[in-house]
Swiss-Prot record:
One of its GO terms (cellular component) is cytosolic large ribosomal subunit. Part of the 50S ribosomal subunit. The keyword Ribosomal protein applies. NCBIfam families: rpmD_bact. This is Large ribosomal subunit protein uL30. One of its GO terms (biological process) is translation. It comes from Dehalococcoides mccartyi (strain CBDB1). Belongs to the universal ribosomal protein uL30 family.
Amino acid sequence: MAKIKITWVKSTIGYKFDQAATIKALGFKKLNQSVIQDDSSAIRGMILKVRHLVVLEEVT
Protein backbone atom coordinates (compact mmCIF):
# COMPACT_ATOMS: atom_id res chain seq x y z
CA MET A 1 0.00 0.00 0.00
CA ALA A 2 1.22 3.52 -0.75
CA LYS A 3 2.35 5.76 2.07
CA ILE A 4 1.80 9.47 2.66
CA LYS A 5 3.69 11.89 4.89
CA ILE A 6 1.49 14.35 6.78
CA THR A 7 2.96 17.38 8.56
CA TRP A 8 0.96 19.37 11.13
CA VAL A 9 1.75 23.05 10.41
CA LYS A 10 -1.02 25.12 12.05
CA SER A 11 -2.43 25.07 15.59
CA THR A 12 -5.95 23.89 16.35
CA ILE A 13 -6.57 26.78 18.76
CA GLY A 14 -9.72 28.61 17.67
CA TYR A 15 -11.04 25.67 15.63
CA LYS A 16 -13.76 23.22 16.57
CA PHE A 17 -13.02 20.36 18.97
CA ASP A 18 -13.63 17.69 16.33
CA GLN A 19 -10.76 19.06 14.23
CA ALA A 20 -8.40 18.82 17.22
CA ALA A 21 -9.62 15.25 17.78
CA THR A 22 -8.92 14.44 14.12
CA ILE A 23 -5.35 15.75 14.48
CA LYS A 24 -4.88 13.45 17.50
CA ALA A 25 -6.43 10.52 15.60
CA LEU A 26 -3.90 11.00 12.81
CA GLY A 27 -1.15 10.42 15.40
CA PHE A 28 0.11 13.94 16.05
CA LYS A 29 1.34 15.05 19.46
CA LYS A 30 3.22 18.29 18.69
CA LEU A 31 3.00 21.07 16.14
CA ASN A 32 5.39 20.72 13.15
CA GLN A 33 5.52 16.95 13.68
CA SER A 34 5.35 14.61 10.68
CA VAL A 35 3.76 11.17 10.56
CA ILE A 36 3.70 8.55 7.83
CA GLN A 37 0.36 6.82 7.28
CA ASP A 38 -1.05 4.34 4.79
CA ASP A 39 -2.83 5.99 1.88
CA SER A 40 -6.37 4.76 2.60
CA SER A 41 -9.75 6.34 2.12
CA ALA A 42 -10.21 6.69 5.90
CA ILE A 43 -6.94 8.61 6.28
CA ARG A 44 -7.75 10.72 3.21
CA GLY A 45 -11.11 11.62 4.78
CA MET A 46 -9.42 12.74 7.99
CA ILE A 47 -6.91 14.81 6.02
CA LEU A 48 -9.76 16.43 4.08
CA LYS A 49 -11.35 17.49 7.38
CA VAL A 50 -8.17 19.27 8.58
CA ARG A 51 -6.63 20.20 5.22
CA HIS A 52 -6.13 23.81 6.37
CA LEU A 53 -3.95 22.60 9.27
CA VAL A 54 -1.69 20.04 7.57
CA VAL A 55 0.60 19.59 4.57
CA LEU A 56 0.52 16.35 2.59
CA GLU A 57 3.38 14.67 0.65
CA GLU A 58 3.57 11.39 -1.24
CA VAL A 59 6.27 8.97 -0.04
CA THR A 60 7.87 6.76 -2.65
